[in-house]
Amino acid sequence: WVINGEKHYISGAGDPRCKIMITMVVTNPDAPKHLRQSQILVPLPYPGVEVVRPMYVFGKDDAPHGHMHIKFDNVRVPKENIILGEGRGFEISQGRLGPGRIHHCMRSIGVAERALELLCRRALSRTAFGKSLAELGGNYDVIANSRIEIDMCRLAVLKAAYMMDTIGNKEARKYISAIKVAVPNMTLKVIDSAIQMHGALGVSQDTPLAAMWTGQRTLRLADGPDEVHRRVIAREELKQYQ
């Protein structure tokens, strides 16, 4: 195989322990859409593979893990380096993305719980105008709504996991897409409330909240942006009435 092209945001390629890439390439542009791509193993470092630069995410390079911009210039690898066979790249990706998305959402629930904990501790420990912050400005509602929304999303994640176990990843895609939209957005909302409760401290390096927020905001793009998942959900719903 001879590989040419480039890609941005190749996560993990900056880590010195990264010695092999699973590279998604077009091997048959004339095939049906889901059979055009293949996955090929490319060692690192390797002739023709140029790591151009680390891509920044919200101003940080995320070293040493990194999200790299990489170019491939006539990269020649043995034909045996293909995974499963020609045209099966999309199939492989789809098999990974469902479990990957639900894993992201499970971790996001944990992030939301941590943010709510920090919010509550701050609300009880900080006073203003002779009262704790919890008693001011409708903050009871903020705390209550955060708990409600976290638990709603947790149940949605559990349902998606159940559907994956019972009907399979492909058939459960509506439920997977639903949590991929709902959970990061919910978590961002809880983190934002926690930041607001902390004031300037919330965006400083002295709490994890700023890093939590950037991670969850990035997750709305990783493994498919919200808009793509909403399209999946809507199309699956409409199928019931066509």
Report residues per predicted region.
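Short, solvent-exposed coil/turn linker segments
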Residues: 32, 43, 77-78, 132, ...
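Solvent-exposed alpha-helices and their adjacent loops that cap or buttress functional pockets
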Residues: 12-17, 30-34, 59-64, 84, ...
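Cytochrome P450 core scaffold surrounding the K-helix E-X-X-R motif
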Residues: 51, 81-86
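Active-site beta-strand/loop segments that form the cofactor-binding cradle
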Residues: 2, 6-8, 12-15, 27, ...
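Alpha-helical interface subdomain recognition
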Residues: 1, 69-74, 85-90, 94-242
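Flexible, small-/acidic-enriched active-site or ligand-binding loops
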Residues: 45-76
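A short core secondary-structure module
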Residues: 4-52
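Short, solvent-exposed loop/turn segments at the edges of secondary structure
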Residues: 16-18, 35, 65-67, 208, ...
